[in-house]
Amino acid sequence: MDRLKTFKRIMEKSDSNRVIILTNHYQIKGNVYDCGECNRDEFINLTNVRVCNVIDSYDGICDSESSFDWLHINIDKVVAFSFV
């Protein structure tokens, strides 16, 4: 099964679309937006997004957080994720 299908299956089982995603450099929090006509096989679409440098997020306080209405993340860049 490909990574995006696995991601979506876990989202369905968790009964939440709120996610924290870690890449090598960023901690990303947002709501998964599942749009059938706009989804691409390799991207996770998020709304109401907050992005923080991973190094800044270790102590739980992010001094340089950025906010976005929309963010599209390449599934191949995801290191870890958790639905909350």
Regions found by a protein language model. Give the residues of each.
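Conserved RNA-binding domains used in RNP assembly and mRNA/RNA metabolism
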Residues: 1-84
